[in-house]
Amino acid sequence: MQGRLSAWLVKRGLIHRSLGFDYQGIETLQIKPKDWHSIAVILYVYGYNYLRSQCAYDVAPGGLLASVYHLTRIEYGGDQPEEVCIKVFASRRNPRIPSVFWVWKSVDFQERESYDMLGISYDNHPRLKRILMPESWIGWPLRKDYIAPNFYEIQDAH
């Protein structure tokens, strides 16, 4: 079943894949990494002016990594804001996705957290560096194939 946004994208020749609807009726779309930045700009111009959240997850051990964006179309005088969920999958070997920082500034720390925990590199992000783990940390703690070190160095807080 195709939703309103998916039909609108098809009508304009924008490549995507509909993944259906969640339990709240929010449409979920899959966008290829190479198409993501241009489609993000188009969605912003179309009215999706609020990025509610961005997160990432490891699909399966040895499999793909996913970056997920929850967008909201807020219109003045509208009763119910329209929402959409966008999933962008990246290969585990070289997980690179265009950053949408220059479209929605609120994604700044969220993309940094996804980089820090899963190793997804967001191209053209102005400050892509670890945010939770120390810069010296090796590996990506939320990947399903991550092997936790058997020691932890206690650092002085001073």
UniProtKB/Swiss-Prot annotation:
A single Gene Ontology CC term: chloroplast thylakoid membrane
Catalyzed reactions per annotation: a plastoquinone + NADH + (n+1) H(+)(in) = a plastoquinol + NAD(+) + n H(+)(out); a plastoquinone + NADPH + (n+1) H(+)(in) = a plastoquinol + NADP(+) + n H(+)(out)
Membrane topology: Peripheral membrane protein
InterPro entries: NADH_DH_suC, NADH_quin_OxRdtase_su_C/D-like, NADH_UbQ_OxRdtase_30kDa_su, NADH_UbQ_OxRdtase_CS
Enzyme class: translocase
GO biological process: photosynthesis, light reaction
Subcellular location: Plastid, Chloroplast thylakoid membrane
Keyword Transport: yes
UniProt keyword annotations, A-Z: Chloroplast, Membrane, NAD, NADP, Plastid, Plastoquinone, Quinone, Thylakoid, Translocase, Transport
Gene3D superfamilies on file: NADH:ubiquinone oxidoreductase, 30kDa subunit
Family: Belongs to the complex I 30 kDa subunit family.
Subunit architecture: NDH is composed of at least 16 different subunits, 5 of which are encoded in the nucleus.
Entry protein name: NAD(P)H-quinone oxidoreductase subunit J, chloroplastic
